[in-house]
Amino acid sequence: MNAPDGLQRCFVLHRRPYSESSLILDVFSEEFGRITLMSKGARSKRSNLKGALQPFTPLLLKWSGKGAMKTLRQAEPISLGLPLTGINLYSALYVNELIGRVLMQEVPMPGLFHDYLFALTELAQADNPEPALRRFELALLAAMGYGVDFLHCAGTGEPIDPQMTYRYREQKGFIASVRRDNLTFLGNELIAISERRFLTKEQLQAAKRFTRIALKPYLGGKPLKSRELFIQMRIPRTRSMEK
């Protein structure tokens, strides 16, 4: 994919040191999707980019190069970084890791970029991050072509009944079921997932179950680092509350 002619709206998903003064950036761009950039000299004392090339800071970036790793040529922060703290910060790190693990390099996804920006904005303001996370996971699955009909029974084609139980079958959809287990959902839960609107705790938990099932093949067996960090954060907090 050719390099852009002008500045592009981007977010840094992850950054790591390279050599004595440079950075390698995993970037999510509006028009080019995920790209890898080298920012030469970004860690030097004289660099004015040192504080700008951070996750959750809206950026305008320009780069050059044709290989897998491009060279950053220009960077301008659009605004200050989004105010993310505590559990909401760990939730945003999870979103970044999810994009980095699931999306292929250099596949344009402008719609998902807007969903990502909306998710970060929600997380910066939310008391409970769970609804924003579920909405983004569902948007990510849709962007990758993971099409699921939440509103019709895959066996009969009839509209989903809010009171009935349905079993999820991968690549088929939801089939009416009389048993309840981890792969079954109430009709009202499926309707809530379709509308991305979660009015009850049960609907939110059902959405989390579904996205875990759907994302598992993309994530493989490797655990998410952000989830491990979140668990480590919760353990000291729980112990202090017990004291």
Curated annotation (Swiss-Prot):
It comes from the Bacteria. Keywords: DNA damage, DNA recombination, DNA repair. GO terms for biological process: DNA recombination; double-strand break repair. The keyword DNA repair applies. Gene3D superfamilies: Nucleic acid-binding proteins (2.40.50.140), Recombination protein O, C-terminal domain (1.20.1440.120). GO terms for cellular component: bacterial nucleoid. PANTHER family: DNA REPAIR PROTEIN RECO. Involved in DNA repair and RecF pathway recombination. Belongs to the RecO family. This is DNA repair protein RecO. The lineage of its organism: Bacteria, Pseudomonadati, Pseudomonadota, Gammaproteobacteria, Vibrionales.
